[in-house]
């Protein structure tokens, strides 16, 4: 079994990837989507989203990073994919699942699930453009308005050359509302010969067990569940081995938060950093009651020095 950290725009950036992969249990992670259209993007654009390329395409914990592209122009995607490989991408992932309205209006993400033929063209052209030893993978939802074309889309991706398909078991219209329709993952696996990875609504070890029972998927991808419970992958890995599951305590999480905050101060402006910390705290409230107290304490705080003191960070250089 492999457990992947999902790509989430504006949330799972290199700072949070570094924090979460250090906890353990995550086998690979993916960049936020890198939007490409009409032209070959410069190297610094890729490094912005994948700073791990400077570290052999791995986080400091040694977790491999995949690079995800988003767009609808097969030629442009293929050219940028080839360049990304030159920069160090070990795996190329294609985004056909983003539900954001602004992205869909620009013919990116889940809107392309209405066009299985285009999915096939994109994957096949990217596959031809990158070295044979670099896998091309894809992430999809079950459809746009409904699941009518789910199987056709999966076939198109596999036939185009996708080596693996991550299935977020909801439609675009479903957004992130529960439930995730895990039974569809099993149906998709029946019609394609490549591995299918289950994604959606895995917040606990028990969710993982139910997902596995329903869809039979060997591998899983977790997004918000891992952000809300940073040791979830480690818990699942332990459960899968029959070992005792010992959840991370709030006290054990504190050093992570402090390190994360210090990294935000280094990589972001003093205006951006407080919002980034609060964004993570909001999701942590789903697993830790103490996070609610901390969030309420910091909610209106914008002074970074004050936040540093409230977090108990050392002010020494």
UniProtKB/Swiss-Prot annotation:
<dbReference type="InterPro" id="IPR018517">
    <property type="entry name" value="tRNA_hU_synthase_CS"/>
</dbReference>
<dbReference type="InterPro" id="IPR035587">
    <property type="entry name" value="DUS-like_FMN-bd"/>
</dbReference>
<comment type="similarity">
    <text>Belongs to the Dus family. DusC subfamily.</text>
</comment>
<keyword id="KW-0288">FMN</keyword>
<dbReference type="GO" id="GO:0050660">
    <property type="term" value="F:flavin adenine dinucleotide binding"/>
</dbReference>
<feature type="active site" description="Proton donor">
    <location>
        <position position="98"/>
    </location>
</feature>
<feature type="binding site">
    <location>
        <begin position="223"/>
        <end position="224"/>
    </location>
    <ligand>
        <name>FMN</name>
    </ligand>
</feature>
<dbReference type="InterPro" id="IPR013785">
    <property type="entry name" value="Aldolase_TIM"/>
</dbReference>
<keyword id="KW-0560">Oxidoreductase</keyword>
<keyword id="KW-0694">RNA-binding</keyword>
<dbReference type="GO" id="GO:0102262">
    <property type="term" value="F:tRNA-dihydrouridine16 synthase activity"/>
</dbReference>
<feature type="binding site">
    <location>
        <begin position="7"/>
        <end position="9"/>
    </location>
    <ligand>
        <name>FMN</name>
    </ligand>
</feature>
<feature type="binding site">
    <location>
        <begin position="199"/>
        <end position="201"/>
    </location>
    <ligand>
        <name>FMN</name>
    </ligand>
</feature>
<feature type="binding site">
    <location>
        <position position="139"/>
    </location>
    <ligand>
        <name>FMN</name>
    </ligand>
</feature>
<keyword id="KW-0521">NADP</keyword>
<feature type="site" description="Interacts with tRNA; defines subfamily-specific binding signature">
    <location>
        <position position="299"/>
    </location>
</feature>
<keyword id="KW-0285">Flavoprotein</keyword>
<feature type="site" description="Interacts with tRNA; defines subfamily-specific binding signature">
    <location>
        <position position="278"/>
    </location>
</feature>
<keyword id="KW-0820">tRNA-binding</keyword>
<feature type="site" description="Interacts with tRNA">
    <location>
        <position position="95"/>
    </location>
</feature>
<dbReference type="InterPro" id="IPR001269">
    <property type="entry name" value="DUS_fam"/>
</dbReference>
<dbReference type="GO" id="GO:0010181">
    <property type="term" value="F:FMN binding"/>
</dbReference>
<feature type="site" description="Interacts with tRNA; defines subfamily-specific binding signature">
    <location>
        <position position="276"/>
    </location>
</feature>
<keyword id="KW-0819">tRNA processing</keyword>
<dbReference type="InterPro" id="IPR042270">
    <property type="entry name" value="DusC_C"/>
</dbReference>
<dbReference type="GO" id="GO:0000049">
    <property type="term" value="F:tRNA binding"/>
</dbReference>
<feature type="binding site">
    <location>
        <position position="68"/>
    </location>
    <ligand>
        <name>FMN</name>
    </ligand>
</feature>
<feature type="site" description="Interacts with tRNA">
    <location>
        <position position="176"/>
    </location>
</feature>
<dbReference type="InterPro" id="IPR032886">
    <property type="entry name" value="DusC"/>
</dbReference>
<feature type="site" description="Interacts with tRNA; defines subfamily-specific binding signature">
    <location>
        <position position="35"/>
    </location>
</feature>
<dbReference type="Pfam" id="PF01207">
    <property type="entry name" value="Dus"/>
</dbReference>
<comment type="function">
    <text>Catalyzes the synthesis of 5,6-dihydrouridine (D), a modified base found in the D-loop of most tRNAs, via the reduction of the C5-C6 double bond in target uridines. Specifically modifies U16 in tRNAs.</text>
</comment>
<protein>
    <recommendedName>
        <fullName>tRNA-dihydrouridine(16) synthase</fullName>
        <ecNumber>1.3.1.-</ecNumber>
    </recommendedName>
</protein>
């Amino acid at each position: 079994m492999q457990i992947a950290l999902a790509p989430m725009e504006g949330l799972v950036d290199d700072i949070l990837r570094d924090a979460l992969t250090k906890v353990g249990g995550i086998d690979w992670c993916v960049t936020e989507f890198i939007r490409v259209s009409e032209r070959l993007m410069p190297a610094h654009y890729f490094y912005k989203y994948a700073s791990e390329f400077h570290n052999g395409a791995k986080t400091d914990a040694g977790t491999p990073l995949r690079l995800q592209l988003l767009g609808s122009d097969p030629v442009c995607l293929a050219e940028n994919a080839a360049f990304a490989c030159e920069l160090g991408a070990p795996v190329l992932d294609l985004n056909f699942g983003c539900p954001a309205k602004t992205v869909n209006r620009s013919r990116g993400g889940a809107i392309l699930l209405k066009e299985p033929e285009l999915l096939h063209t994109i994957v096949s052209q990217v596959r031809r453009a990158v070295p044979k030893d670099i896998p091309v993978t894809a992430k999809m939802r079950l459809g746009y308005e409904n699941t009518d074309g789910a199987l056709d889309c999966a076939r198109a991706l596999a036939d185009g050359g996708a080596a693996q398909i991550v299935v977020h078991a909801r439609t675009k219209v479903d957004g992130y509302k529960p439930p995730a329709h895990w039974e569809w993952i099993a149906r998709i696996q029946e019609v394609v010969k490549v591995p299918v990875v289950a994604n959606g609504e895995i917040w606990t070890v028990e969710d993982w067990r139910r997902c596995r029972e329903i869809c039979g998927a060997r591998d899983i991808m977790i997004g918000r569940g891992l952000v809300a419970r940073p040791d979830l992958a480690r818990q699942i890995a332990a459960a899968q081995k029959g070992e005792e599951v010992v959840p991370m305590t709030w006290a054990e999480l504190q050093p992570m938060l402090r390190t994360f905050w210090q990294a935000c101060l280094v990589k972001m402006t003093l205006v951006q950093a407080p919002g980034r910390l609060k964004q993570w705290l909001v999701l942590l409230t789903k697993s830790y009651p103490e996070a609610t107290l901390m969030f309420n304490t910091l909610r209106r705080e914008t002074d970074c020095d004050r936040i540093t003191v409230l977090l108990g960070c050392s002010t020494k250089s």
